[in-house]
């Protein structure tokens, strides 16, 4: 390795105390959740409080740690300053609608109209997932928040929500000037919240989203860790993801290459040898393409990485580069 090349570890993330938001993403099946859990464990050793959030509908955090997590943050057994939560996007919007409908009366008609408007917005379930995150984060004070994201395409949509929601809420606020009095007479007369209260809440949400949007584009506060395996499709997805992140002005300078094979000397396994050669070809391409990135190389594990102890052991590979010793 060139002496001028960035260190092949995620120690740079651990050392960057200013980081507030860390996204971990990649193609499905590359070890994204294992990496995000392991990074969270390492950060918990250096930060006062860490929150790990799953925005992947599959929700593998519970399986990884071997304990049940839900929409409210809960501490990881044995690591008191690390909390996890799993967000159900569809549940978030359904809960909002049910709460609004419970008011009944004439306001229910307005609720149905708002429901129709809400569901006509592309990606609204994921947007509500983002709103759920904001609500949770605003009521707490975690030092750093890590997102175990959905597979690649969903991840990038999630990162654009601050901009999308900011524009949408801006338009809704404009409508308040034109229809505010009418909504006030419809809603206020039913003993529910007034239109002014509703629009004030929308404006408050927009301000929060705008603030977070600015933070996402600040490399001192936000970074994205790409996880891949040394195969063509994964490399292709990673390149597309890096380009998209760059176009969104979101910092990314760390890539984790997972599931690397290291056949033993004298091993006559033809399949192992063939896969090793293929992996080395794509690993070289990754090293050439991203020479200014921190590229972490992780070996294929002989057993599933599940439970706190196994994750702690695996997490050391993120900060202490793996050294293969031939027998």
UniProtKB/Swiss-Prot annotation:
EC id: 3.6.-.-
InterPro entries noted in UniProt: Anion-transp_ATPase-like_dom (IPR025723), ATPase_ArsA/GET3 (IPR016300), ATPase_ArsA/GET3_euk (IPR027542), P-loop_NTPase (IPR027417)
Residues annotated as binding Zn(2+): 269, 272
A single GO cellular-component term on record: GET complex
Gene Ontology MF terms: ATP binding; ATP hydrolysis activity; metal ion binding
UniProt xrefs under Pfam families: ArsA_ATPase (PF02374)
Enzyme class: hydrolase
Binding site for ATP: 27-34, 231, 258
Subcellular location: Cytoplasm; Endoplasmic reticulum; Golgi apparatus
Enzyme active site: 56
Coiled-coil stretches noted in the UniProt entry, renumbered to this chain: none
Primary subcellular site in the record, as a coarse category: cytoplasm
Keyword field: ATP-binding, Cytoplasm, Endoplasmic reticulum, Golgi apparatus, Hydrolase, Metal-binding, Nucleotide-binding, Transport, Zinc
One GO-annotated biological process of the protein: tail-anchored membrane protein insertion into ER membrane
Function as written in the Swiss-Prot or TrEMBL entry: ATPase required for the post-translational delivery of tail-anchored (TA) proteins to the endoplasmic reticulum. Recognizes and selectively binds the transmembrane domain of TA proteins in the cytosol. This complex then targets to the endoplasmic reticulum by membrane-bound receptors GET1 and GET2, where the tail-anchored protein is released for insertion. This process is regulated by ATP binding and hydrolysis. ATP binding drives the homodimer towards the closed dimer state, facilitating recognition of newly synthesized TA membrane proteins. ATP hydrolysis is required for insertion.
Family: Belongs to the arsA ATPase family.
Assembly, per entry: Homodimer. Component of the Golgi to ER traffic (GET) complex, which is composed of GET1, GET2 and GET3. Within the complex, GET1 and GET2 form a heterotetramer which is stabilized by phosphatidylinositol binding and which binds to the GET3 homodimer. Interacts with the chloride channel protein GEF1.
Name recorded for this polypeptide: ATPase GET3
Species per Swiss-Prot/TrEMBL record: Yarrowia lipolytica (strain CLIB 122 / E 150) (Yeast)
Native organism taxonomy: Eukaryota, Fungi, Dikarya, Ascomycota, Saccharomycotina
